[in-house]
Amino acid sequence: MTARPLSELVERGWAAALEPVADQVAHMGQFLRAEIAAGRRYLPAGSNVLRAFTFPFDNVRVLIVGQDPYPTPGHAVGLSFSVAPDVRPWPRSLANIFDEYTADLGYPLPSNGDLTPWAQRGVLLLNRVLTVRPSNPASHRGKGWEAVTECAIRALAARAAPLVAILWGRDASTLKPMLAAGNCVAIESPHPSPLSASRGFFGSRPFSRANELLVGMGAEPIDWRLP
């Protein structure tokens, strides 16, 4: 991640929303450069670390929270749960998300694991921790990203615009108090990981429920269809 002003790294609305933690973003850039200098790599690629914030802040209607990026080299792309179009097999959490997607919405399985269309249509795919060491899950937790992503979530919640937060798992559910302000509703269920998907994620209908809530709040529903 290069040392550049926040306004050059993220979308204009996000630059304003994240201004209170601009120094922390710069600090995290220094942390990542120090990791590289020490011979330690990180994921995703530097240009994708803040990718979730390159889509318009004002367009966000749904928030889907992940924990940290996929630690498998080649998987993390800067959007929670998403992978590059050429990645196969899909990570098991993503495969379970797609199983629920087809069951909930009746759409066929997507042709690939790229969730960029959701991001383009108003879904913020945000990991609480934005980087990870390859093959070392949770290795960057507690290093400082949480302050950045919590600022982002509070900024979304403070808007007057409707927001549906899809909170999968216990870690994501701890964010619920931050969403108490504004016009926000949370959908909670177990995480789509293989360890917990059968305990209530399957059958939770997060996509159709999110749209029902958005329409009820006077907002446009999300077009969830993937190619």
Swiss-Prot record:
Described function: Excises uracil residues from the DNA which can arise as a result of misincorporation of dUMP residues by DNA polymerase or due to deamination of cytosine.
Reaction(s) catalysed (UniProt annotation): Hydrolyzes single-stranded DNA or mismatched double-stranded DNA and polynucleotides, releasing free uracil
Listed HAMAP family: UDG (MF_00148)
Protein family membership: Belongs to the uracil-DNA glycosylase (UDG) superfamily. UNG family.
InterPro entries per the UniProt record, alphabetical: UDG_fam1, Ura-DNA_Glyclase_AS, Uracil-DNA_glycosylase-like, Uracil-DNA_glycosylase-like_sf
Annotated protein name in UniProt: Uracil-DNA glycosylase
Domain of life: Bacteria
Subcellular location: Cytoplasm
Enzyme Commission (EC) number: 3.2.2.27
Keyword Hydrolase part of the UniProt annotation: yes
The organism of origin for this protein: Mycobacterium tuberculosis (strain ATCC 25618 / H37Rv)
Chief location: cytoplasm
Gene Ontology cellular-component annotations: cytoplasm
Keywords per UniProt: Cytoplasm, DNA damage, DNA repair, Hydrolase
Single GO molecular function: uracil DNA N-glycosylase activity
Active-site residues, Swiss-Prot/TrEMBL: D68 (proton acceptor)
GO biological process, alphabetically ordered: base-excision repair; base-excision repair, AP site formation via deaminated base removal
Principal EC category: hydrolase
PANTHER family linked: URACIL-DNA GLYCOSYLASE
Signal peptide: none
Keyword Transcription in annotation: no
Gene encoding the protein: ung
Any single Pfam family the record assigns to this protein: UDG
